[in-house]
A protein has these predicted regions:
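Active-site-proximal specificity loops/subdomain of glycosyltransferases
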Residues: 58-102
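Short beta-strand/loop segment that forms part of the nucleotide-sugar
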Residues: 44-57, 81-85
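N-proximal low-complexity "stem/linker" segments adjacent to membrane-targeting elements
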Residues: 1-38
Length: 303
């Protein structure tokens, strides 16, 4: 039984969490419920959940549980977008870009539906982008445009929870000891979540929509922003709630070879060539125009 509890929420009003979603199994449904309750109870922020499927499992099965667990002001932070589609392929990069264009905050967060960070990691990541990185010798803050809030290597805490341990975690105000015996340290590389300055994210091409389904988009994004922007990564842990995998989340998907070829092409480009590619690739030009149009619409509405 999930309980409503009111706890202190930290203000992350300048951030929008972007969560692409397809609920393909019972454990994926449990994961999105857990993640959203964690975000909504701990932070005052903005969340977009973009679901694409034949029917909205989020609306029929997730929302009732969220309404039971969250206070009205917490639940109101979630914007749910549903796109009806019979296409089996999950085009994650396209959904993320749709949400980035719709977002109206300085910071956008590419956020998987099954991850949890320590509270301080969220706060630090947003602060770095808004205020820069303060050098220890007293120099002016260095600009930060992208944050990876977890380390490279054994910083992933893989968790295989049960319904009971998830309920205990939530009802204990998120005591991670609720998962005792259900976790192991594992490899963390480039996925999970990233915090971006929204304008920089759009300028540098956001998610490359030519990566379809699963594979190599995380590697390419990390390479690109390290080459062309200002990135910080710090050695914190990240919890990954495990789940059943279909080909949409594994290397057996039918787009994997095309994704690999694109990654092999981009990874050897010089900074100049990489920048030129993202200045001219068609999807990115369309997205930048959408961002301009969206900004003009917001300005006229505010006026």
């Amino acid at each position: 039984m999930l309980e409503q509890k009111e706890i202190v929420r930290y203000g992350l009003d300048d951030a929008t969490f972007m969560i692409p979603l397809r609920i393909e199994s019972a454990d994926r449904m449990r994961n999105i419920i857990t993640t959203l309750i964690y975000l909504c109870r701990n932070f005052r922020t903005n969340i977009i959940v973009y679901e694409i499927d034949q029917e909205s499992i989020f609306k029929s099965a997730v929302v009732p549980q969220l309404e039971q667990a969250l206070l009205p002001e917490e639940f109101s932070m979630i914007t749910h977008i549903f796109e009806k589609s019979d296409d089996y392929t999950f085009h994650r990069t396209r959904l993320l870009n749709d949400m980035a264009i719709a977002a109206q905050t300085k910071v956008v967060v590419n956020y998987d539906s099954d991850i949890i960070l320590p509270q301080l990691s969220y706060i630090k990541a947003v602060d770095f982008i808004l205020n820069g990185y303060n050098a220890e010798d007293g120099r002016p803050p260095e600009p930060v445009k992208c944050v990876y809030p977890y380390g490279f290597g054994e910083y992933q805490i893989q968790c295989t929870p049960t319904d009971e341990s998830v309920s205990n975690f939530i009802n204990s105000n998120f005591d991670f000891n609720a998962f005792e015996g259900q976790t192991r340290k594992w490899d963390a590389k480039y996925g999970f979540c990233q915090f971006f300055d929204r304008e920089e994210y759009i300028r540098l091409g956001m998610e490359n929509e030519n990566f379809i389904s699963y594979g190599y988009e995380d590697d390419e994004r990390y390479m690109r922003f390290n080459a062309l922007s200002n990135v910080i990564r710090y050695n914190g842990d990240i919890m990954h709630l495990e789940h059943t995998r279909t080909s949409n989340s594994w290397f057996t998907n039918p787009h994997i070879e095309e994704n690999r070829s694109l990654w092999e092409k981009l990874r050897v480009m010089s900074k100049g060539k990489l920048s030129e590619y993202y200045d001219n690739v068609e999807y990115a030009k369309v997205r930048r125009q959408q961002a301009l149009d969206n900004g003009q619409e917001q300005s006229s509405t505010e006026a």
